[in-house]
Structures are given as structure tokens and as C-alpha cells.
């Protein structure tokens, strides 16, 4: 009985990473999908794409064995010195799927992540990218409302 359990456990361990890897969306699939939507996509490294949308360069990183996706945009038109932590925290508390912060260079940075565990599809990536674009707009609206108020 113990022998059968050991064999079953070994089979699960051996094949589990394969199924997770199979669910990973490749960088080239992401690039092709976003390019087909009219976005300017640039391959800048083994796991990184930059996508130009209006005035923003959005960095997409594909990380880890499950293909976790990280979207980041640096909002260079916003001076980090002019944005209080109160404004950042208000936005971060209201938006649970993204976050805005001031990076080590003083740049205002917006980030959103997708955990690849369980798999993701091109449709998920396209949807996430649209959500990230809305998140940028939402933060800029939030910032404007705080400055005007």
C-alpha cells in the first residue's frame, strides 16, 4: 500500500510542473496578440516586452515557471514630489488589483500583476491589458480630483 502511495505521489510531482508549464502563455503569443490590436510592441529581453500606448510605455514581464504576468507603467508626467502618500494610499485602498507607488528614482509607477498559477489564456492577457489601461486613466483622474479638491 505504501509503495502505491509513493508511486502515485511521484507521478503527481513529476507531471504537475508539466501541466502548469503547458498553461503558460508565451511572450511571443502576447506580443502577437497586442500587435494584432494595433499596439506598438517591442521585444526588449528574454521575458520582457514594452508596449507603447499614447504617451505611456508599458512594461510587461513574464516571470516564473507559471508565467506570472506583471504590467508596469511609469507616469513621467507626474512628479513624485508632488504626490503625497495619502493620495497614493487612497487609490491603492480603492483598487485591489493594482497599486501605485513612487519608485527608488522618484518616479510614480503603476503596477498590476496576474498570478499564472492555474493557467492563463490570451483572452485573459488581452482583458488584463485593457484593465491596466483603464487603471492608468483611473489613477490620473484620481490624481486630478485630489489636486483640484
Question: What role is predicted for each listed range?
Answer:
Residues 118-149:
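C-terminal partner/receptor-binding element of secreted or periplasmic proteins
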Residues 6-16:
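Bacterial N-terminal signal peptides
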Residues 45, 53-55, 62-64, 73-77, ...:
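A mature extracytoplasmic/lumenal domain signature
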Residues 72-111:
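Short, internal acidic amphipathic alpha-helical interface segments
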Residues 16-22:
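Sec/Tat signal peptide C-region and signal peptidase I cleavage site
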Residues 22-68:
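N-terminal secretory signal peptides
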Residues 27, 31-34, 85-88, 126-129, ...:
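Extracytoplasmic/secreted envelope proteins and their assembly/folding machinery
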Amino acid at each position: 500500500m505504501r509503495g502505491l502511495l509513493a508511486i502515485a505521489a511521484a507521478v503527481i510531482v513529476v507531471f504537475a510542473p508539466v501541466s502548469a508549464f503547458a498553461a503558460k502563455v508565451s511572450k511571443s503569443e502576447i506580443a502577437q496578440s497586442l500587435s494584432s490590436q494595433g499596439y506598438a510592441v517591442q521585444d526588449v529581453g528574454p521575458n520582457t516586452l514594452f508596449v507603447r500606448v499614447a504617451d505611456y510605455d508599458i512594461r510587461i514581464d513574464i516571470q516564473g515557471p507559471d508565467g506570472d504576468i506583471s504590467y508596469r507603467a511609469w507616469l513621467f508626467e507626474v512628479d513624485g514630489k508632488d504626490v503625497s502618500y495619502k493620495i497614493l494610499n487612497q487609490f491603492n485602498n480603492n483598487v485591489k488589483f493594482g497599486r501605485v507607488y513612487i519608485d527608488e528614482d522618484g518616479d510614480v509607477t503603476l503596477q498590476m500583476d496576474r498570478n499564472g498559477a492555474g493557467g492563463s489564456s490570451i483572452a485573459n492577457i488581452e482583458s488584463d491589458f485593457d484593465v491596466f489601461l483603464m487603471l492608468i486613466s483611473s489613477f490620473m483622474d484620481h490624481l486630478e480630483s485630489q489636486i483640484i479638491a
